[in-house]
């Protein structure tokens, strides 16, 4: 959803990659599991503590999955295991940085709340009204994380089942209840990963692209759609923000403090 950086590329116009998602999807039919750690570039005009123009991402794609639950469980389990290892292997370092105490769910599963339920709980608890319910507000993200830590003993929580109006063209949709198979993994008040199930049916993909106003005959979509035409398995994955994970693990309040030479709307060098 972010804007792109454009550049000249041998007399052609290219853009810096926001995400390797399309490539992951093309690959997953052959490799079944795809992993990448790389920088992503987003021309977001946001001067906030949450955003940067250059971010380090862990991208995962899983093929032949049984459904969205499997994708959510895999990403959740990976995050729990990662945090356990960090807090075990680097206990002295974290103590010297005054990192918060780690709280993880006793049953080993990241708790889940639908986005509609979070809106309802937040409004009841705070008496605030959420105007745009397609997504969570930053205050809602902080509130549900505080609730999960206090009531469920978990620093991690999922917000799931986003409404159809929030869907991107590549999302698999649950038309029966008007939601999208899409979850956001939240950690100590901040989204650190987006975890959706992708649409893998060629005809539905073409229809959803047209609904989004995209030109399905554009050269840029040629090889992407070709993979769907040949056949892709049920698949899903995540884009996981490594900088944000570091920020919240240490207990910082600004993602730029967790990044060497951060890039934002005001900083290009060093």
Regions found by a protein language model. Give the residues of each.
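Active-site pocket scaffolds in enzymes
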Residues: 196-197, 202-270
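A generic structural motif
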Residues: 59-70, 189-192
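Active-site lining segments that contact anionic ligands and/or coordinate catalytic metals
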Residues: 11, 32-34, 55-57, 153-156, ...
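Metal-assisted phosphate- and nucleotidyl-transfer catalytic regions
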Residues: 1-4, 77-188, 211-233
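Class II aminoacyl-tRNA synthetase-like tRNA-binding/catalytic domains
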Residues: 1-57, 61-65, 247
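Short conserved micro-motifs at the rims of enzyme active sites and ligand-binding pockets
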Residues: 27-28, 47-50, 69-72, 169-172, ...
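A residue-level signal for conserved active-site and pocket-lining positions in enzyme catalytic cores
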Residues: 16, 30, 60, 118, ...
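His/Asp/Glu-rich mid-to-C-terminal helical/loop segments that flank catalytic regions of hydrolases
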Residues: 31, 35, 66-88
């Amino acid at each position: 959803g972010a804007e792109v950086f454009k550049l000249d590329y041998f007399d052609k116009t290219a853009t810096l990659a926001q995400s390797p998602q399309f490539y992951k999807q093309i690959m997953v039919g052959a490799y079944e599991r795809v992993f990448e750690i790389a920088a992503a570039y987003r021309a977001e005009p946001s001067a906030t503590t949450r955003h940067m123009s250059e971010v380090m991402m862990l991208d995962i794609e899983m093929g032949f999955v049984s459904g969205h639950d499997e994708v959510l469980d895999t990403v959740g389990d990976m995050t729990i295991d990662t945090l356990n290892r960090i807090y075990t292997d680097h206990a002295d370092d974290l103590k010297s940085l005054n990192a918060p105490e780690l709280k993880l769910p006793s049953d080993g599963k990241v708790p889940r709340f639908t986005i509609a339920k979070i809106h309802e709980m937040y409004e009841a608890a705070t008496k605030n009204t959420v105007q745009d319910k397609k997504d969570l507000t930053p205050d809602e993200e902080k509130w549900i994380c505080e609730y999960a830590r206090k009531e469920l003993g978990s620093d991690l929580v999922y917000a799931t089942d986003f409404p159809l109006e929030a869907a991107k063209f590549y999302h698999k949709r649950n038309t029966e209840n008007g939601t999208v198979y899409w979850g956001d993994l939240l950690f100590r008040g901040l989204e650190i990963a987006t975890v959706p199930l992708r649409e893998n049916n060629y005809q539905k993909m073409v229809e959803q692209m047209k609904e989004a106003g995209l030109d399905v005959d554009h050269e840029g979509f040629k090889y992407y759609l070709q993979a769907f035409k040949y056949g892709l398995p049920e698949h899903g994955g995540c884009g996981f923000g490594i900088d944000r994970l570091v920020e919240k693990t240490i207990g910082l309040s600004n993602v730029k403090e967790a990044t060497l030479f951060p890039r934002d709307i005001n900083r290009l060098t060093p």
